[in-house]
Amino acid sequence: EIRYSDWSSDVCSSDLKDPRKTTTYGVGQLILAAAESGVEKIIVGLGGSSTNDGGCGAAAAVGVKFYDKDGKEFVPTGGTTADICKIDLSGKAEILNKVEIVTMCDIDNPMYGPTGASHIFGPQKGADEAMVLELDEGIKNLSRAITEAIGKDISEVPGTGAAGAMGAGMIAFFGSRLQMGIQTVLDTVKFDEMISDADYIITGEGKLDSQSLRGKVVIGIAERAKKQNKNVIAVVGGADDAEIDKAYEMGVTAVFPINRLPQDFSISRHHSKENLAYTVDNVLRLIAAKDRKSVV
């Protein structure tokens, strides 16, 4: 039996906009409950969280202990990871050692630094510039403590910065391996076989930006399609002009943003369905016109 945990459903809340205070504790409880229910494999999907605690909350929920410089035990949040002095893994629930835990994420960001958890994703969670720096220093300190606890530096492992550095926490505290979510999905549906006789592949996401280039759906599909010389059309809510050329190099044939008028997102989001339909209709008309010309 396999149990799945969807990160954004479990820990994301639009009402919680302070990543210094949010915690992954509940996710740890869910993982432990799944293990105790007798499952053999747990798949955790990371992304869309409101947290930045490096998985410390989840770890605490399964028995991992964190101590500050005074030797006092506490449960770190994003705002207190800088206070971690020592991590003790000896109390972790033994049943977790009997379960295979796989963690899927769609990005390859490291734990900290300019492309790490706090700098790239912190602003999406309500962090201003000063808070981003604070959170980043905390994750950097957590990385140091993890290295001391497990005897290995995992800070540069691709994906450790996912979901507020929970990727790192899943490796360090749960003995999990990280794998790209999109690759897992594509393998499951036999994508390479599916597109073998396709002329065009239409995919999309909310915004094509620097995060997209680090392994999300559009690029994951484009890289597979490129190996078979297939055309990939990305229909997106918006696109970062600075990243489009890179997307083309990675296998995307064309990018079509759906917004038809210069409107603020608060307005355009109410017209997403019709804008999407209008854009896809135009894409299909263009493809049909090309095919008719080829026949002539």
Predicted regions and their residues:
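Single conserved hydrophobic/aromatic residue that forms the stacking wall/gate
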Residues: 1-12, 293-296
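Glycine-rich oxoanion-binding loops at beta->alpha junctions
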Residues: 9-36, 178-199, 207-208, 267-272
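Carboxylate- and glycine-rich phosphate/diphosphate-binding segment that chelates Mg2+/Mn2+
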Residues: 16, 22, 72, 101-163
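Glycine/threonine-rich beta-strand-loop-alpha-helix active-site module
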Residues: 21-32, 36-43, 50-100
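Structural motif
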Residues: 41, 199-200
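Structural beta-sheet core signal
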Residues: 44, 103, 234-235
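Oxyanion-binding "anion nests"
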Residues: 134-198
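C-terminal non-catalytic interaction/assembly regions of soluble proteins
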Residues: 200, 206-292
